Amino acid sequence: MTKLALFGAGGKMGVRLTRNLVNSDFDVLYVEVSEAGRQRAKEAHGVDCVTPDEAIVEAEVVVLAVPDTAIGAVAKDIVPKLKPGTMVVCLDAAAPFANHLPERADITYFVTHPCHPPIFNDEATPEGRADHFGGIAAQQGVVNALMQGPEEHYDLGEKVAKCIYAPVARSYRVTVEQMAYLEPGLSETVCASLLVVMREAMDEVIKTGVSYDCARDFLLGHMNILGAVIFDEVKGGKFSDACNKAIEFGKPMLMRDDWKKVFDFEEIKASIIRIT
């Protein structure tokens, strides 16, 4: 049984991951340095936390469930103490992409991140439909990157990913650089920004006297069908001539001509530096 150490077990993400790890095939050591975090882990899942040094001695896999801004400092402290061949799992590409992980050739760096449950799904239970983040009851995809280490370590890293993010429907292998284009590039810089604009647009309509419920119902319903057509969920789906004309005139008013520069490598790099 693989010995896995979860660092940050009492934090927001650590508590999420523990939900799946407590019933897994891994022999888990829960690591939390703060007393409040230790108490939170105990109350949430009944687990007792150990010190970092206790975990490092035995760990074959180390999962860093700590904020992006803290990964560099945490990794700098623990990586030199790990046994050769140990796998270090990061839950986001930001810190690895920004070179915040210590150089050490005899350990493995594996990066994994959830896609989160998709808008279009076939969840059959109330729990699944309510699990917007994933890791509880809704199926989701995961993306993984073997940043460094022997090729045979990929399967172990993917096993960890499928456990902590379960239930997992699909698993995708990418590079760390490609993962950075997915997040923050695609998911945050583009998607989150445009969703904020959509919410602001809804608020503008509400100012005209349309009720909140009406505007929200109208917008989310149209997001459903428009999204189904745009993202190939409806085979052969097409917009009306009026809708296409609205897009033709609306998009230039909303988007700069050079907006795709957000995917330039230097822009992605700058975005990651800002958040780490």
Predicted features and spans:
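Rossmann-fold dinucleotide-binding core
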Residues: L91-E183
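NAD(P)-dependent Rossmann-like dehydrogenase/reductase catalytic/cofactor-binding core
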Residues: I206, V210-T276
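Active-site-proximal catalytic alpha-helix in oxidoreductases
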Residues: A138-Q140, E151-K207, D213, D217-V229
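Small-residue helix-packing motif on alpha-helices
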Residues: R38, A55, I71, S211-D217
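Conserved SAM-binding strand-loop segment of SAM-dependent methyltransferases
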Residues: G46-P52
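NAD(P)+-binding Rossmann beta1-loop-alpha1 motif at the extreme N-terminus of oxidoreductases
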Residues: M1-H45
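Rossmann-fold NAD(P) dinucleotide-binding segment
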Residues: P52, I56-H100
